[in-house]
Amino acid sequence: MAGPGAAFRRLGALSGAGALGLASYGAHGAQFPDAYGKELFDKTNKHHFLHSLALLAVPLCRKPLWAGLLLASGTTLFCTTFYYQALSGDPSFQNLAPVGGSLLLLGWLALAL
């Protein structure tokens, strides 16, 4: 499957591999500051997996560049913000998460076009 969406398919596969690696780290190696950090990490990891799968569908939509850019940037911004908070206990970047979440929402809508 070539074309503008093929890169996002590969990015989705790499993102999924990264999500799996982070899930393993969270389950076996991470030191969380508190129970909330572990819960936040696990929820973030589920979102990471879900949106990695969405990236795999990007080549199938009519606007792959828009959908792919929105989903990739939204996943990065949303998940990185919460992974950081979960591992450090520092919530100073959490105000970026709604921006990432909004980009994810727009990415899902772009898949529907």
From Swiss-Prot:
UniProt KW Transmembrane helix keyword: yes
Membrane topology annotation: Multi-pass membrane protein
Classification via InterPro entries: DUF423
Keywords: Acetylation, Membrane, Signal, Transmembrane, Transmembrane helix
Regions of this protein lying in the Extracellular compartment: 30-63
Membrane-side (Cytoplasmic) residue stretches: 85-92
Modified residues (N6-acetyllysine): 43
Subcellular location: Membrane
Coiled-coil blocks: none
Leader peptide range in chain numbering: 1-29
Superkingdom in the source lineage: Eukaryota
An annotated GO cellular component: membrane
Pfam families reported in the protein's UniProt record: DUF423 (PF04241)
S-S bridge residues: none
Positions of transmembrane segments: 64-84, 93-113
Major subcellular site: membrane
Family indicated by similarity: Belongs to the TMEM256 family.
Protein name per the record: Transmembrane protein 256
Organism: Bos taurus
